[in-house]
């Protein structure tokens, strides 16, 4: 899975600077590799792992043991035997042996986004399982790959990146604030949660849980995070990893609960009403739950990796610097809990983060062509669903829409099902196969246009299903086209875009600290940052497509769409004046601009005549 970590003979590097350091976000090589530690650094490690009695540490210093000596544990043990008291030796040797195991077989992966990253051997054991390797066959961005040819990356490499960044952040906090009592167990559990947080994704990632399951299993409240927790349990038990986890110092019941809670939230939903709903870690370590999946404000290492990775593969500029933010984070207490806070001067960087998220959704994730391809794949999967059988545990058979009920069956469900349908010769799959052939030939459903409702007119989710029929009933009365269309001819895709917290400003939920008093958590209002920041943080875009290919029918469908926009008091489609010039004058609000607003720039006084108001 990678090459062994750097050689034992490397010279010790300078200790990483703290806040504002230009070093790697995970510290210098000397910080990361115990084999490069001096005696004092080993003493710090012993102290942070419960072996910190002053007399013991004094005697350990006298032994002169360094990290390089961990390779020869018998010789190391001999020095400790001479220096330490009998009841101290076992505790010291157990702690150092665990450290030696970690240092001995750390693996290095060459990641295109983060560079050379070190992965703990327990994480490597998790990676080398069928359940994790499955992520190699699930596209990170689903149907977006059909539009952006560089977006061929998968959930596998994203998961490696999240596990790595989770370790970077928690180690930085441990180094900066020893009083937090972050242990090696905590670090390992956070890394595992980051690594395994996406185990439950289905074919084409969010297309499966966002489009297919809501249609195939209507009324089922299912999330991929739920499947991630179940798949993690299945991974551990089916590969018999309990013993190896214990050998690295994990306490199974407590730590597995902690890992699952980081991925999917509190295990017991009824416990959410309690003051502290989590079981894996006490309230004193509440900040650990904000690293992998931050439910409070959405700032977490999952986003940091997919921003960087998706931008890299899409060819889109990433303006958010997660490395800098890691250097300016610390834990402060607020509301009787400890939270991860950012330095006050980083508020602009965080707005850049959410702006990057919005740009990615606009330009890539919600691309009109990528979305209609996912809709067509979803249709194909629906038509193939009842004819596909996937064997699960005890020989029981499942369909595409039910495979997530059994993790053995779900392990076999990947993007490959697209090719199985495409290349099948089974007559019962002919309808599904034909839809996929249309995608391959680029015979996509025709885009008619998009419109935006005002905030007060936004369409609620329970009305989505009736929109196609509403458009079909909107045949223009003035010069109507000689074509009758039905609801089956239209596809309506309602896209809700925001900064991650619907219509709220996510920065309102972020805590900061200032240089003058780094222990105090504060909030920063939008007005304190800039007057150029957005006034609203969400909007709804309605896109309409026609399933028919005939140009005459498509032209008529566009007129239906324009008439529907007039009826619903939505914004004018961008090409509304072209596709329905006889309809757009009927809408007063679409034609309230004076002629002077269209004066060309070559005419006199154009600067005074131009208006930029909507």
From Swiss-Prot:
<dbReference type="GO" id="GO:0045088">
    <property type="term" value="P:regulation of innate immune response"/>
</dbReference>
<feature type="binding site">
    <location>
        <position position="155"/>
    </location>
    <ligand>
        <name>dATP</name>
    </ligand>
</feature>
<feature type="binding site" description="in chain C">
    <location>
        <position position="368"/>
    </location>
    <ligand>
        <name>dGTP 2</name>
    </ligand>
</feature>
<dbReference type="GO" id="GO:0008832">
    <property type="term" value="F:dGTPase activity"/>
</dbReference>
<feature type="binding site" description="in chain C">
    <location>
        <position position="367"/>
    </location>
    <ligand>
        <name>dGTP 2</name>
    </ligand>
</feature>
<dbReference type="GO" id="GO:0060339">
    <property type="term" value="P:negative regulation of type I interferon-mediated signaling pathway"/>
</dbReference>
<feature type="binding site">
    <location>
        <position position="155"/>
    </location>
    <ligand>
        <name>dGTP 1</name>
    </ligand>
</feature>
<feature type="binding site">
    <location>
        <position position="206"/>
    </location>
    <ligand>
        <name>dATP</name>
    </ligand>
</feature>
<feature type="binding site">
    <location>
        <position position="302"/>
    </location>
    <ligand>
        <name>Mn(2+)</name>
    </ligand>
</feature>
<keyword id="KW-0378">Hydrolase</keyword>
<feature type="binding site" description="in chain B">
    <location>
        <position position="128"/>
    </location>
    <ligand>
        <name>GTP</name>
    </ligand>
</feature>
<feature type="binding site">
    <location>
        <position position="158"/>
    </location>
    <ligand>
        <name>Mn(2+)</name>
    </ligand>
</feature>
<dbReference type="Pfam" id="PF01966">
    <property type="entry name" value="HD"/>
</dbReference>
<dbReference type="GO" id="GO:0005634">
    <property type="term" value="C:nucleus"/>
</dbReference>
<dbReference type="GO" id="GO:0110025">
    <property type="term" value="P:DNA strand resection involved in replication fork processing"/>
</dbReference>
<feature type="binding site">
    <location>
        <position position="306"/>
    </location>
    <ligand>
        <name>dCTP</name>
    </ligand>
</feature>
<dbReference type="GO" id="GO:0106375">
    <property type="term" value="F:deoxynucleoside triphosphate hydrolase activity"/>
</dbReference>
<feature type="binding site">
    <location>
        <position position="306"/>
    </location>
    <ligand>
        <name>dGTP 1</name>
    </ligand>
</feature>
<feature type="binding site">
    <location>
        <position position="310"/>
    </location>
    <ligand>
        <name>dCTP</name>
    </ligand>
</feature>
<feature type="binding site">
    <location>
        <position position="357"/>
    </location>
    <ligand>
        <name>dGTP 1</name>
    </ligand>
</feature>
<dbReference type="GO" id="GO:0003697">
    <property type="term" value="F:single-stranded DNA binding"/>
</dbReference>
<comment type="subunit">
    <text>Homodimer; in absence of GTP and dNTP. Homotetramer; in GTP- and dNTP-bound form. Interacts with rbbp8/CtIP.</text>
</comment>
<feature type="binding site">
    <location>
        <position position="365"/>
    </location>
    <ligand>
        <name>dGTP 1</name>
    </ligand>
</feature>
<keyword id="KW-0234">DNA repair</keyword>
<dbReference type="GO" id="GO:0000724">
    <property type="term" value="P:double-strand break repair via homologous recombination"/>
</dbReference>
<keyword id="KW-0479">Metal-binding</keyword>
<feature type="binding site">
    <location>
        <position position="303"/>
    </location>
    <ligand>
        <name>dCTP</name>
    </ligand>
</feature>
<keyword id="KW-0862">Zinc</keyword>
<feature type="binding site">
    <location>
        <position position="206"/>
    </location>
    <ligand>
        <name>dCTP</name>
    </ligand>
</feature>
<dbReference type="InterPro" id="IPR006674">
    <property type="entry name" value="HD_domain"/>
</dbReference>
<dbReference type="GO" id="GO:0032567">
    <property type="term" value="F:dGTP binding"/>
</dbReference>
<comment type="function">
    <text>Protein that acts both as a host restriction factor involved in defense response to virus and as a regulator of DNA end resection at stalled replication forks. Has deoxynucleoside triphosphate (dNTPase) activity, which is required to restrict infection by viruses: dNTPase activity reduces cellular dNTP levels to levels too low for retroviral reverse transcription to occur, blocking early-stage virus replication in dendritic and other myeloid cells.</text>
</comment>
<feature type="binding site" description="in chain C">
    <location>
        <position position="147"/>
    </location>
    <ligand>
        <name>dGTP 2</name>
    </ligand>
</feature>
<comment type="similarity">
    <text>Belongs to the SAMHD1 family.</text>
</comment>
<feature type="binding site">
    <location>
        <position position="140"/>
    </location>
    <ligand>
        <name>dGTP 1</name>
    </ligand>
</feature>
<feature type="binding site" description="in chain C">
    <location>
        <position position="442"/>
    </location>
    <ligand>
        <name>GTP</name>
    </ligand>
</feature>
<feature type="binding site" description="in chain A">
    <location>
        <position position="324"/>
    </location>
    <ligand>
        <name>dGTP 2</name>
    </ligand>
</feature>
<feature type="binding site">
    <location>
        <position position="140"/>
    </location>
    <ligand>
        <name>dATP</name>
    </ligand>
</feature>
<keyword id="KW-0464">Manganese</keyword>
<dbReference type="GO" id="GO:0016793">
    <property type="term" value="F:triphosphoric monoester hydrolase activity"/>
</dbReference>
<feature type="binding site">
    <location>
        <position position="306"/>
    </location>
    <ligand>
        <name>dTTP</name>
    </ligand>
</feature>
<feature type="binding site">
    <location>
        <position position="357"/>
    </location>
    <ligand>
        <name>dCTP</name>
    </ligand>
</feature>
């Amino acid at each position: 899975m990678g090459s062994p970590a750097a050689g034992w003979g490397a010279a010790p590097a300078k200790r990483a600077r703290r806040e504002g350091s230009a070093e790697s976000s995970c510290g210098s090589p000397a910080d990361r590799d115990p084999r490069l530690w001096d005696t004092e650094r080993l003493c710090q490690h012993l102290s942070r792992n419960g072996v910190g009695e002053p007399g013991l540490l004094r005697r350990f210093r006298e032994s002169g043991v360094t990290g390089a000596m961990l390779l020869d544990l018998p010789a190391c043990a001999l020095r400790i035997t001479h220096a330490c008291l009998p009841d101290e030796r076992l505790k010291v040797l157990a702690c150092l042996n665990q450290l030696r195991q970690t240092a001995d077989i750390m693996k290095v992966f060459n990641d295109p986004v983060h560079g050379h990253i070190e992965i703990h051997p327990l994480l490597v054991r998790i990676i080398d399982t069928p359940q994790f390797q499955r992520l190699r066959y699930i596209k990170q961005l689903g149907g977006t790959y059909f539009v952006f040819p560089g977006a061929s990356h998968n959930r596998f490499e994203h998961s490696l990146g999240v596990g790595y960044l989770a370790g970077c952040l928690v180690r930085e906090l441990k180094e900066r604030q020893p009083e937090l009592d972050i242990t090696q167990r905590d670090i390992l559990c956070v890394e595992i949660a980051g690594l395994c947080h996406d185990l439950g994704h289905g074919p084409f990632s969010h297309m499966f849980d966002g489009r297919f399951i809501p249609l195939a299993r209507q009324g089922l409240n299912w999330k991929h995070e739920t499947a991630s927790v179940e798949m993690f349990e299945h991974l551990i038990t089916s590969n018999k990893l309990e013993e190896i986890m214990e050998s690295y110092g994990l306490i199974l019941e407590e730590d597995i609960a902690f890992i699952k809670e980081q991925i999917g939230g509190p295990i017991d939903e009824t416990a959410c009403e309690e003051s502290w709903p989590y079981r894996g870690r006490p309230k004193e370590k509440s900040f650990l739950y904000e690293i992998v999946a931050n439910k409070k404000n959405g700032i977490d290492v999952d986003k940091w990796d997919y921003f960087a990775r998706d931008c890299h593969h899409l060819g889109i500029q990433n303006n958010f610097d997660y490395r800098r933010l890691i250097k300016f984070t610390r834990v402060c207490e607020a509301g009787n809990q400890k939270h991860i806070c950012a330095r006050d001067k980083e508020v602009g960087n965080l707005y850049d983060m959410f702006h990057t998220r919005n740009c990615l959704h606009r330009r890539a994730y919600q691309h009109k062509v990528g979305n209609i391809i996912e809709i067509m794949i979803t249709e194909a999967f629906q038509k193939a669903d009842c004819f596909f059988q996937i064997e699960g545990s005890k020989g029981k058979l499942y369909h595409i829409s039910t495979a997530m009920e059994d993790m053995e069956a779900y392990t076999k469900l990947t993007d490959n099902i697209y090719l199985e349908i495409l290349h099948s010769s089974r007559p019962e799959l002919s309808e599904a196969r034909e839809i996929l052939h249309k995608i391959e030939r680029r015979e996509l459903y025709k885009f008619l246009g998009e419109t935006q409702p005002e905030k007060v007119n936004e369409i609620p989710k329970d009305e989505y299903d009736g929109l196609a029929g509403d458009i079909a009933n909107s045949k223009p009365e003035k010069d109507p086209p000689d074509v009758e269309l039905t609801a089956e001819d239209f596809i309506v895709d309602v896209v809700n875009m925001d900064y991650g917290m619907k219509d709220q400003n996510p920065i309102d939920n972020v805590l900061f600290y200032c240089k003058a008093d780094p222990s105090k958590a504060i909030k920063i209002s939008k007005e304190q940052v800039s007057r150029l920041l957005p006034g609203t943080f969400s909007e709804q875009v309605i896109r309409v497509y026609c399933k028919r290919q005939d140009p005459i029918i498509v032209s008529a469908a566009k007129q239906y769409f324009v008439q529907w926009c007039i009826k619903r008091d939505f914004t004018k489609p961008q090409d509304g004046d072209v596709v329905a010039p006889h309809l757009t004058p009927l809408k007063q609000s679409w034609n309230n601009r004076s002629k002077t607003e269209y004066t060309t720039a070559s005419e006199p006084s154009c600067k005074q005549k131009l208006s930029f108001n909507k």
